[in-house]
């Protein structure tokens, strides 16, 4: 099939671009390299479509075929979007992304290279031809400029015209299109086919395909889901489409596999989506009110939400009683502490959904307990993890909130409803970073969870980098008991810098005791320690910040590197993020920066920047197919080399 025919079919609706969650992810370098390959006649790969039923004539790409089916373009979405945007001179209707990536591509008649518009060297220079204008106006639109540039040299003029003609003929190029058809081609089968064919490119998830099929029959599904995601984002919680779809699937089918949605009609899906959105908002309110988990950084265990949404489905969208709520939250906290859903997500979710349907929350807890060898207990060593990306950072925040830990200066309990909804609450290093670095402690030791506590911004500024032996003594004298509310050992000897490891061990023991007491109270029944449950999600909530946070203080050059990546349209990383074993779900390390879906966003292998890995952590990361870098310089060289190779295409 010719490229022009594919684009015409997109306009006509015979081929639709599916409603995948990622939108357009290519960078300008990729667009330029793609057209360089087309111009040189290099192979660009085939295309893959999936023939699926369409119950409505309205789809993302136009109207459906007359036989009630539609061809969803699975492999080639980025390429077709690029071809459409450049040849038509505008992004397609379904476009979501940075439109500048598709506009301004120019061709140099002399060097035969493609570059994006740069006024300094292209404005008024006839050697540079606007590629979109060429496709729109044809060769005739460029003849005057070519004649002037050739300056009466007939041979040179012929060369220029031949080069322009080679560009316009790109749309006439024939490419191979494979079509997946047949009632036996389930979502699981189609995903497997796609990922085998497209092993080196952007991966297609089962959620991608399920959403594509849903949007073929209900085009408003994706905008409706995005509206819910935007509302939660305004409240401080960033979720993804795939996550929301997983919740809907659990509510409607009681299963984890997206293939189960194939049997759900549009009317039921619409009803289930509304119910799920309401349930998630209800859960966020309850988690903020009962556990104090009121912003995205501390909301761990997101993969457990489908199970909790399913429970609410059984009870009309509300907890039937406080006992059920507390026991569910007991299960939820333990599930994220032990990585219940970070490995084989669908397997664990199916087990939990089945347990919930068969025996309620008690069966859920029993399944989790058995998976942990019969014990659900927090040990002091569990708090050894470092940084805000550790699984136990949310637990520290939870304990601070539910027990009403006191601020060191004001004495105010750090509960909800204070300080503009905690917008000025900050993470405080009990032993200041600067002093620990002076004494030779590593980044991981400095940023250990057991060295964190939460204070108001004003208190943090007052303490600054004071010697802990001095300022802790002042606090205990002025406000007896305040340190104990933050689980800070009162043995003065432990406040000395040289005794920092012993301080850590003592505080970990105190935190473990507090955690076990509270989690047991959740299991046994409603606790007298209650927080007011908000009636609606707050908007524009400011997450807790780290006082004096400076990326370069811990990782030299990180701030500059992140700025460069943003300018290059590369994916933004997760900062201070836990990296897990993809097979077992066990935590490996906490990375300074982590690109779970590659630097280009769902293209390539996961990338990890982790300066202080142990040999065991390094081996585990390599076994999990992570690309690991220990410095920003090494990562920058890797990125520069990759871009140079792409530019040479």
Give names to the regions the model predicted.
Residues 246-315:
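Structured, charged N-terminal subsegments at the starts of enzyme catalytic cores
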Residues 532-649:
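Nucleic-acid endo/exonuclease domains
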Residues 76, 417-451:
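Histidine-centered nuclease catalytic patch
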Residues 484-540:
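C-terminal, well-folded lobe of enzymatic/effector domains
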Residues 446-477:
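Short Cys/His-centered divalent metal-binding micro-motifs
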Residues 1-254, 295, 320, 326-334, ...:
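Basic- and aromatic-enriched surface patches that contact anionic nucleotides/nucleic acids
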Residues 336-427, 435:
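Intrinsically disordered, low-complexity N-proximal targeting/linker segments that flank membranes
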Residues 427-429, 456, 593:
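Hydrophobic, well-ordered secondary-structure elements that form the walls
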